[in-house]
C-alpha cells in the first residue's frame, strides 16, 4: 500500500491554495465543501474566485507565492500552470512540515487527492496512487451510477437511531438484522428520496414494532456462468446479507469470496451421475435452515430456473409456507456463447434457439425431428456423457453431418476452452472436454472465427514487466 487512505476534518482549519485558474477552482470547491478556512494565492483569478471572495467564503491573496503564506496553515495545494512555482510551494511546505499536494505531480506531494463520490456522510474515495488517474475517474463514474443520491439521508437516519436501536434490541444479532432491514427497505429509501418525512417516520416505527420473525426466508440466486463480474447487483446484495449460503460446484471461487465473511457456507456440490448431496436432502437443508429463522441464499451457477432444479426446491418451501424469492442469473447458454463469439441467433443463420438438457428423465424423450430442423441453434446443458447419442440422433433425423458444433468448457472464466468441429465429430470431441461444458450446435458457430473477442489465456508474466 503506497498511500494510507485517511479522511481529514478540515472544518475551520486554515488551508492555502496556490493558483487561480480553472484547475485551482475545482480544488477550491472541494476545500470549501469540507469547511476549510481557505486562502487563495495567485497573480490572477477566475470570476468564480472573486464571487466566492465577495460572499466571504474565502480570502484572496494576490501576487507571487511566498513562504510566509504557509504560516499556521494546515495544508496547501499547488495548482498553478508554472512548474517552478509548484516546486517552490512543495519545497517550502516540506520545510515547514505542512501537508502539500501538487496537482498532477505525485512525486512532489505529501498527500494526493482521490476521486470522490460524495453522499455525505457516506464518502467513497478511489485512488490509483497517481499511476492511472483516468482509471480512477472511470471507477468513480461507475460507483456514482450505482450509489443512489439519497444514500446520505439514509446514513444520517441511521446515525440518529443508533442509541434507540441499542436500547430496543438486547443482542447484536437482532441489531444487525434491524439495520439490514432498515438499509434494505426500498419503500423507506423512496420516502427519503421524496423528502416524505412523515411516511418515513411511520415506516421506521413499523420496523421497531415488528415482531421477531419465527421463520426465516430463502432467496434463490443465480450466480451466472462463472465470471464474477456477471453476478447481478441484486445477487451480490443478497449474498452479502445472508446468514447461510448453500452452494454447488458451479459457483466460482471468485463469487464465493464476495459472500459475507461470517455467513455459514454449506456445500452441496453435484456432478452428473454422482450426486454429492441428494436433491431431497438439499431441499431439507433449505427448509431446516429457514425454520431456524435464518436468511438463506441458495446460490446456483447460471440461472436457477434453467436446468437448475430451482423450481423443485421452491416447491418444497412453498409446501411448508416458507417465504422465498428469486434473483435470476445469466444462464450458461448466454454467457458461454457471448464469451465464445457465438451469437445464439443471427438473421442469416438462426431465427430461434433451443435450450436442451442432456440429462432428461428416462421417460422424457426429446423430439429429435424438431431439434434437427434448420435455421435454429441448439444448446445442450450437461451433455458431455450423451454427446455421441446427440450426434447420432440429430444426424439420423436429418441434420447435416457437417453442421458446425462447439464445446465450451469452463465458460466465461480465465480457464475457458472452446473446442470446434462438425456434428459428425461431436462424440469424439466430447472426450477432449471436461465438465462443466456446454454444447452449441448450429451454423452460428461458424461466426466464431470472426466474432471471438475473449482471450482466456492469463498473462505468463506481470503486465508491469511487459511494458
Swiss-Prot record:
Q: Which positions in this protein are listed as binding S-adenosyl-L-methionine?
A: 225, 301-303, 306, 331-332, 382, 411
Annotated region (Precorrin-2 dehydrogenase /sirohydrochlorin ferrochelatase) at 1-204
- What molecular function terms (GO) are annotated for this protein? NAD binding; precorrin-2 dehydrogenase activity; sirohydrochlorin ferrochelatase activity; uroporphyrin-III C-methyltransferase activity
Q: Which controlled-vocabulary keywords does the entry list?
A: Cobalamin biosynthesis, Lyase, Methyltransferase, Multifunctional enzyme, NAD, Oxidoreductase, Phosphoprotein, Porphyrin biosynthesis, S-adenosyl-L-methionine, Transferase
Pfam families xrefs: CysG_dimeriser, NAD_binding_7, Sirohm_synth_M, TP_methylase
UniProt keyword Iron present: no
Q: Which residues carry this modification: Phosphoserine?
A: 128
| Pathway listed | Cofactor biosynthesis; adenosylcobalamin biosynthesis; precorrin-2 from uroporphyrinogen III: step 1/1; Cofactor biosynthesis; adenosylcobalamin biosynthesis; sirohydrochlorin from precorrin-2: step 1/1; Porphyrin-containing compound metabolism; siroheme biosynthesis; precorrin-2 from uroporphyrinogen III: step 1/1; Porphyrin-containing compound metabolism; siroheme biosynthesis; siroheme from sirohydrochlorin: step 1/1
What EC number(s) are associated with this protein in UniProt?
2.1.1.107, 1.3.1.76, 4.99.1.4
Q: Which domain of life is it from?
A: Bacteria
Residue numbers binding NAD(+): 22-23, 43-44
Q: For the region Uroporphyrinogen-III C-methyltransferase, what residue ranges are annotated?
A: 216-467
Q: Which NCBIfam families match?
A: cobA_cysG_Cterm, cysG_Nterm, PRK06136.1, PRK10637.1
What functional role does this protein have?
A: Then it catalyzes the NAD-dependent ring dehydrogenation of precorrin-2 to yield sirohydrochlorin. Finally, it catalyzes the ferrochelation of sirohydrochlorin to yield siroheme.
The entry sums up its family as follows: In the N-terminal section; belongs to the precorrin-2 dehydrogenase / sirohydrochlorin ferrochelatase family. In the C-terminal section; belongs to the precorrin methyltransferase family.
Under what name is this protein listed?
Siroheme synthase 2
Give the organism the record lists: Serratia proteamaculans (strain 568)
